[in-house]
Design a protein with these regions (language model features):
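Pre-recognition alpha-helix immediately N-terminal to the DNA-recognition helix
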Residues: 47-49
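Alpha-helical residues within the helix-turn-helix
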Residues: 65, 76, 82-83
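N-terminal leader segment of winged-helix/HTH proteins
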Residues: 1-40
């Protein structure tokens, strides 16, 4: 009995099916975007920022005080999260407020157990 995993009688056709499957399920461009997203979460401070922003939008100074970060450090982390589309900013006069872009991001992180 032959395995259906690697049917050798038509290797060329099977190889093409595998490439199509990879294009559909493991698209390189999408994987690159997803890896950048996860890289943006690969820092304890950025995860803590997200946990704060789950509660409400906050200005940089609130995040600095809450997490005991300097202004340059807080801005650095916020910039990375904003660049990857995880958070957005809104300027009101002299104040810049940050909020999570999409609640689906939080739902996905919660399903992965990243927000417990």
């Amino acid at each position: 009995m032959r395995s259906s995993i690697c049917p050798a009688e038509d290797a060329t056709k099977y190889a093409e099916e595998l490439r199509e499957l990879a294009d559909k399920m493991a698209n390189k461009a999408l994987a690159k975007k997803e890896s950048r997203f996860f890289k943006s979460l690969a820092d304890e401070s950025r995860v803590r920022v997200l946990k704060l922003l789950m509660l409400r939008e906050m200005c940089v100074c609130e995040i600095m005080v809450a997490l005991n970060l300097t202004q340059p450090t807080a801005s650095h982390h916020l910039g990375i999260l904003e660049k990857e589309g995880v958070i957005k900013r809104k300027k009101e006069g002299k104040w810049v407020y940050y909020a999570i872009v999409d609640s689906e991001i939080l739902e996905g992180m919660n399903k992965l157990g990243l927000l417990n």
